[in-house]
């Protein structure tokens, strides 16, 4: 009976198992297909769009209002103006209606205006005359002879104007216009010269482009949730089907994960230390501002360019940053994902990847050190900020690990999880194709697994979960956007660029060899060590079919992943060097593999090992043949950040090249000896022990990077450095804003001149100034810049201001002064003349010097011309003499010169720029009681002029104190992470804030990087500020680092007295393919 009972129990168990298998098959197939379909239709499902309309006049009054559109142009605009309004204007005329201030930069080129002058009424749009009518024809009101109203429309169909009631010679209504969609005007508000109550019939209505301001409908939310739930169900069912192989359950995390070694401690400590003191990545400020503004706007806009279009379909990672901003915007917190990804990459490398490559790798200590140190050396210059390369590197590594697990165990669940990981990795950025390369590298064995498994359970239960896993990312990418909006955003980015063709991939490597930050020592090593190890591994594995202790399949899949990624990168639309951060993790694995391949156990002949050592020394030569540059503020105090590293005048590149030549010649010598020659102790030490070439080189570079940052902190202390700012942030520090000092009023702080008989220039000119005049400055001398024509975006008001004052200043000068200096209080003396040249000398009056204190650390002289001085960037620059002489009380009650100071002069190579010469009080004796300016221009070359103003002791406040955290600021894309406490100009419902200030990087970066990137022609924010505001550069200094150009603070003044417009908001349900038309991106 017991036998029968057991057989019965077995039969029941078999039937139950069979039934469970059938259920799992059906669940995997049906849930997978439902998840796939639900994900695919998500982009097409409807959303609720927030609509916004600008209607004017508002509150029944003819007031100008502001409403700067982040898309710059509206969907459409209509305007109706009663002709009685024209008749009511004074004889001189005025602006009836405009979409920008008339005095804004290039206002006529960008905006729509209805202008009235003494003779005509003009409707102009973007410098095109739509219609012009004699003013005497536009007389009377509705019902009276003549014009009754002016009607203007601007849509995708074109821009047209009609003077209702006025006919042409043929008796037809007088109408004009052009069917050009690019004539739609830019709107920063509605501006008028009219005053008083709004007359009946006067109206303007503009539909604001809010296509990206949307939320999912209930239907779409249901579809997304259904896609996620069914995908999870399909994966669980697939896992159940995998259990049919009869193998016992394996631990998800193997026991080896709990074992920690000295390598683990060193690598993790390196990551933690670098997180605190290390350099940041190039676009941190960019991503920071996108994240900080996303919550207010309701979507992740590409804030600085491309007309406020979203990052989708790539960039879901930035939404994580936006969530983190709710906790804190401190650098060490917001950069935490990169730290976590770095540590996770090492744990995966040491516990999953290296064991898969074979016992020869995981059991060889130099290989472990090579992996850890190469990971650190490649991670440090690229992946310590907010750029997504670190997350992509982790995604690619996880994909590779899952593929290897799938191949090892012959199961499909890891394949599905690898597909899911690859999909989300590519959803971060197009360079996430590195994960797809990993999938393709393992494609053949995975296909074999699929074919083998489908014989037992069928095809659809295996394929459907894969389809669902690969497409569920669409529910994240299109959660709030539609297919139509994402396609439009993609078109905008492609049309404006950068969007480079595949055959320009050489640019990426060209940038790497330039002596710039992109081609700096650290960035070169991170890529070149990976490339050297990769091609070495390829050559050796091709030559040696079987290598003891090395798993050939995983090794080739690792190599194939990197080679495939290099191929895929050629199709990426941008060619930036920072994309090489993708290779940090997989490159470390290849480094470990190569360390074994070039060891004595594999390369028996010392010639080959020495040849590899020579190649590595040549890589080091290339790495040191550039600057030790780091991005923006990360370079502060770093040795050789603008020059090739050297010792006693000899560059390290030269030293490494000599070593390379010696080793290469020795390898050449070994080529002609027998294979056993050259196996001495030194050679074995260099190629076999811990001092093996790869870990030694990577360790050396890691120490160089860390040492550079530590040196920067020590040399900068107590002023700004990356590491010191991160530490201060723990107690509420505000980054660079705590160390940048601002003069709230540059007219304050001028000292009293001691009485004497001075010449015609007053105390500034002293008793007998020679060659200096009150107007000795050439026209178009502007503050902290070289004026160029045509003006580029982001320039200050003084670029376009009159070149002469309407009334002479205090000493008869008509030269406009910078920094808001009042010519009625501040005199000027300069040597510029177009006539006969002469040697010029000036010794000013003695000015009474107040006692030094913390609020007054400087004596400042505002000057222009080619002046001898010192700066961090340029070192000592030569020119004419402008020095500050300080004096002590003399024996007869007079003053005795006690010494002279050469100025810190940031703009020594920009002779036609007004700037502030800085003289530190700390360099003067405490008992100095007076100072005076001594200037000499002994050159007879007309370009060697100089101009000076009296010295002042300004009262300084930190930028954080002056600007605060509540006023809207245009933070240029480079500076955002360094100024975490300043409030960025926000945008919502298609309209932006109006900033009070602009913070820029240093002069060169502003001119080359931010001014051009944020240009209004590219859909950038400068298209708003240039048209609406007037910028003035303020006097600023970096505390205790007076010779450094940290950047600039510019104050915005409105061109017109206005108040923000009130928008009419509503909602509308839009399908996934609905579009209001194309965004106007052409000039």
From Swiss-Prot:
EC number(s) given by UniProt: 2.4.2.-
GO BP terms, alphabetized: Actinobacterium-type cell wall biogenesis; cell wall organization
GO cellular component term, pick one: plasma membrane
An annotated Gene Ontology molecular function: arabinosyltransferase activity
Compartment(s) where it occurs, according to its Swiss-Prot or TrEMBL record: Cell membrane
Membrane topology according to the record: Multi-pass membrane protein
Keywords, comma-separated and alphabetical: Cell membrane, Cell wall biogenesis/degradation, Glycosyltransferase, Membrane, Transferase, Transmembrane, Transmembrane helix
Membrane-crossing residue ranges in chain numbering: 23-45, 222-239, 252-274, 331-350, 357-379, 421-443, 456-478, 525-542, 555-572, 576-598, 611-633, 648-670, 690-712
UniProt xrefs under Gene3D superfamilies: 3.40.190.160, arabinofuranosyltransferase like domain, EmbC, C-terminal domain, subdomain 2
Family (UniProt): Belongs to the emb family.
Protein name: Probable arabinosyltransferase B
